[in-house]
């Protein structure tokens, strides 16, 4: 998710140019496997310029993760800010949108999860960025679960979170469309957490 465009518009600042180039490389090749020289060539910048904006590679990785988070927030806002659909329908819309990305053969997995896999226990700033992103995702689902009037919103939110993470991991590894009806599964999960007597 959150990787809808890699194109670099003419109006990009040098900082954004570097971040977008690094994002594409980190997404496809991983973090350790992507060297500084390749980032410089892809962004068409000098080493002096790179280190002017990002003194260390870890600084650049944190900036890329922050941009990834902001991009996903912006994408999700198209669903979250709608006033014409219920909390339940917003949850379903999030999963439908996610499935579209997961079914794409070019999906390389969640950047935050990939970063955590490479830097867990090695770089606290990167770990913190990854945790912040996932905690935000969980909080979005918790808010929507409450809006949907779930009996136990925290419980429902975490189940939805696990399902979303599982879908992402399966898509990254199997490289094939999900063979089951995710919308139906999510709908049934939500319904199982509603108090029908109050509806």
Label each region the model flagged.
Residues 1-29, 33-45, 59:
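Basic, helix-initiating cap at the start of DNA-binding domains
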Residues 127-131, 147-193, 197-199:
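Hydrophobic/aromatic-rich alpha-helical bundle segments in the mid-to-C-terminal region
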Residues 83, 119, 171-174:
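Secondary-structure edge/capping motif, primarily at the C-terminal ends of alpha-helices
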Residues 44-54:
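Short hydrophobic/aromatic patch on the recognition helix
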Residues 103-124, 128:
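Amphipathic alpha-helical segments used for helix-helix packing
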Residues 63, 67, 77-104, 147, ...:
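Hydrophobic alpha-helical connector segments
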Residues 73, 89-92, 122-147, 158:
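Amphipathic alpha-helical packing segments from all-alpha helical-bundle domains
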Residues 58-60, 115:
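A secondary-structure capping/hinge motif
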């Amino acid at each position: 998710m959150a990787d809808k465009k890699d194109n670099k518009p003419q109006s990009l600042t040098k900082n954004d140019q570097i971040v977008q180039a690094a994002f594409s490389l980190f997404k496809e090749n991983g973090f350790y496997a992507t060297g500084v020289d390749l980032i410089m060539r892809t962004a068409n910048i000098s080493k002096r310029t790179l280190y002017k904006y990002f003194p260390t590679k870890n600084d650049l990785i944190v900036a890329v993760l922050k941009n990834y988070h902001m991009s996903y927030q912006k994408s999700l806002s198209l669903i979250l800010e709608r006033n014409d659909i219920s909390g339940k329908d917003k949850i379903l819309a999030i999963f439908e949108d996610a499935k579209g990305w997961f079914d794409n053969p070019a999906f390389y997995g969640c950047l935050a999860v990939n970063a955590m896999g490479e830097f867990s226990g090695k770089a606290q700033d990167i770990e913190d960025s990854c945790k912040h992103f996932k905690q935000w995702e969980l909080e979005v689902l918790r808010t929507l679960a409450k809006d949907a009037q779930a009996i136990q919103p925290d419980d429902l939110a975490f189940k939805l979170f696990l399902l979303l993470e599982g879908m992402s991991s399966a898509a990254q590894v199997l490289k094939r469309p999900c063979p089951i009806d995710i919308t139906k599964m999510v709908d049934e999960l939500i319904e199982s957490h509603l108090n029908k007597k109050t509806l």
